[in-house]
């Protein structure tokens, strides 16, 4: 969890610098989304609450919220990825007595970043999508995969909360980008078919 909070601090700091707006103003609205994510362990199930929290911020453009939050809920799984990288190293040390080599870890991290984009926003989605990587790249046996699933499930709620809360920072960056490039706000009306 400490890693999650450090990552969120870096992410919101970078978003504040890039956009020229306060990331703390965005972050202060994310309490309900964070708690919902902890309870559901699902970015998809937390989406409605996250949208509501993001719309409360004065620093986020409404059109960027409507575009960014649903997109990032599906492709931005930083908390899950951070946790999984830490856990593969821990499980490797515990079961096999050594950490994975630098080469396999670099390859694993690169591929995990790609796999995480396609992982479903459901409980355990990231680790389930990456089991092939864990066994194929890091050469974990069945006992290593089983331990990864068990340990990951115990903390998945906090990874999901980091994912959802980080979406606010990315949307702040998106707002900053739109303003720097003079992209005007679009008001989309409901269309009846």
Language-model-derived ranges and their functions:
Residues 85-193:
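Transmembrane alpha-helical segments and their short flanking loops
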Residues 36-116, 184-191:
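Helix-loop-helix junctions within the multi-pass membrane cores of secondary transporters/permeases
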Residues 16-17, 50-60, 171-177:
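Helix-loop junctions at the membrane interface of multi-pass solute transporters
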Residues 6-7, 46, 83, 166:
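Residue-level signal for transmembrane alpha-helical positions in Major Facilitator Superfamily
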Residues 1-13:
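Entry/N-cap segments of selected transmembrane alpha helices
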Residues 22-38, 62-70, 142-149:
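The feature identifies polytopic integral membrane transport proteins across all domains of life
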Residues 14, 18, 22-23:
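Transmembrane helical segments that form the transport core of multi-pass membrane transport proteins
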Residues 1, 34, 71-79, 154, ...:
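Loop-to-transmembrane-helix entry motif
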